[in-house]
Structures are given as C-alpha cells and as structure tokens.
C-alpha cells in the first residue's frame, strides 16, 4: 500500500489509512527486509495508523506510537451468530460427513509454510499412534497441498479428510471437537476467533499472539516441540469442561462482534473526514 499512500499524499488526499495485519515474529527474511524498507515511508505518508492487534501495531508502527495511542486497533471481528455452537447442526454435519462418536480434530486455513501444514499431518499421525477412535478434517487448499496429501498417504492416514475450500466452515467447526493452529507466524488469526466462538478446544503455537486468547480451553505450545510431544499434549488437555454454547458470549464480550466493530469503524471514518476536511 506504500505506493498508493505516496500517490494519495502527492495529490492531497487528507485521510490516508494503513492497516498492519502481521506481527514481526518469524515472518521470513524477504518480508522482514521489505517491511524495514517501507516502515519509514509508511510512517511519513500515513495519517491514520491501523492494526489488527497490539503485536501487529508494534511490528509496523513501533512501540512509541502504540504507547502514545496513535494506532487504532480494529479487531478482526466475525459474524458471531454464524459460529455460535449448535448441537443440532453438529449432529447434522457429522452425519453428512459419515462421522460417528469419534473425536474429530481439525484445522482451517491455507496449506502453506506459514500454517505449518505438514507439521499438522505429523501431529495427527502421532495422535493416531496413541488413539484410534478419531478422524481429522483438513479444510483449505494452497501451495503445499500436494506435499500435505502425499505425507498423509505415506502415513496411511485414510481417516484424514481433505475438504478443500468450503462455504460451511462454521458448521464444520461445530462438527469438530479439537482445533489445531501450529502456525509459524500470524498477525491476529480470524480463524482462531471463529474456532473459539464455536467453543472448540484449541491448540495453537507460541508464535500466535496471546491477545486472541479468550476462552479457557485454548492452549499454547512451543514450535520447538516435536509432533509426538504435541500429540501427547493435545491428548492430555483435549477434554475440556468448557461449555461450547458459551463461546459466542465470550467472543462478543472480547470485542469481536462484526456489527459492533463495523459501527466503530464507520464512526472513526466520519470523525477523521470531519477533522481533516473541514
């Protein structure tokens, strides 16, 4: 967006917003170098600094701007009603997928280096070594798809269902019991907001910001641990007493309701335009 903001400043556009989505943790050398080059430019041409969370704000705008409250944090909000847990939808979707009473693990996201997709397969393979009555729903496509499917085939994971891109992610989350997100890096992953709204027990890497930790059944674990250690940790902590029906209320109270955030953003735009255009 740096080029667009430069042009906007050149032609006298009074309100110029730039939104940071990624934190600086482990995002790769090329991206890191690009960000370092663009930071001073963006700080000069941006009138209103936005970010999806505190870590993403510090990464692009710097700690001083965050401490001085110059950065507007706009939560990655969702339509919470769509992800509110429903026992009837769960039963219907599980029947549709041929699932019974087994523990259903799952993930949603691009099959990519960032999402650590092959590692997810390795974790589930280890889970299967300790536990037989289970299945895995892998929702998403991406550049690592062939590699991921080959690895699952190599391990003989016929119970790992690849569902590709779907428009019923909310219902699939209700069919799941456990959600995995061992990403190498993230900004503030909206999929984890959705998973918590659906009341899922979640296991995420320590590269994911704890700003998004809302429900008590969300567990962080280190990327320095191997797949067997992850599998044992998951099995030891997956049986949560958290009532999945409370997921939506928790997410709404934490500020991730789309209607509320959209209204806040609308009000911000109106104030910014009035302040700088009058």
Where are these regions (language model features)?
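A short, histidine- and acid-enriched strand-loop-helix "catalytic/donor-clamping" loop
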Residues: 2, 11-31, 47-48
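A short helix/loop element that forms part of the nucleotide-sugar donor recognition site in Leloir-type
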Residues: 84-98, 240
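A conserved mid-protein helix/loop that constitutes part of the nucleotide-sugar donor-binding site
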Residues: 103, 107-126, 143-149
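Short hydrophobic beta-strand element within catalytic cores of glycosyltransferases
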Residues: 201-205, 210
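A charged, aromatic-enriched C-terminal amphipathic alpha-helix characteristic of glycosyltransferases
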Residues: 241-278
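Aromatic "clamp/platform" in nucleotide-sugar-dependent glycosyltransferases that forms part
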Residues: 165, 184
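Donor nucleotide-sugar binding/catalytic pocket of nucleotide-sugar-dependent glycosyltransferases
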Residues: 44-88, 220
């Amino acid at each position: 967006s740096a080029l667009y903001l430069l042009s906007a400043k050149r032609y006298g556009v009074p309100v110029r917003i730039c939104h940071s989505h990624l934190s600086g943790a482990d995002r790769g050398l090329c991206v890191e170098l690009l960000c370092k080059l663009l930071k001073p430019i963006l700080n000069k041409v941006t009138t209103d600094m936005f970010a999806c969370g505190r870590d993403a704000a510090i990464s692009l705008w710097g700690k001083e701007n965050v401490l001085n409250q110059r950065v507007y944090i706009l939560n990655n909000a969702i339509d919470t009603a769509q992800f509110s847990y429903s026992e009837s939808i769960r039963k219907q979707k599980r029947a549709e997928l041929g699932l019974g009473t087994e523990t259903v693990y799952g993930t949603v996201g691009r099959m990519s280096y960032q999402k650590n997709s092959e590692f997810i397969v390795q974790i589930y393979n280890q889970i299967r070594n300790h536990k037989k009555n289970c299945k895995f729903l892998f929702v998403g496509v991406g550049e690592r798809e062939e590699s991921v499917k080959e690895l699952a085939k190599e391990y003989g994971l016929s119970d790992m269902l690849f569902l590709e891109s779907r428009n019923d992610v909310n219902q699939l989350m209700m069919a799941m019991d456990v959600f995995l997100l061992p990403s190498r890096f993230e900004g503030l992953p909206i999929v984890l907001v959705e998973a918590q709204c659906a009341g899922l027990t979640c296991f995420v890497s320590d590269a994911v910001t704890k700003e998004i930790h809302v429900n008590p059944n969300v567990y962080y674990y280190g990327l320095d641990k191997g797949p067997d250690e992850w599998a044992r940790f998951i099995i030891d902590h997956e049986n949560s007493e958290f009532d999945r029906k409370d997921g939506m209320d928790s997410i709404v109270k934490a500020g991730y309701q789309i209607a509320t955030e959209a209204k806040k953003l609308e009000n911000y735009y109106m104030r910014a335009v009035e302040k700088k255009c009058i």
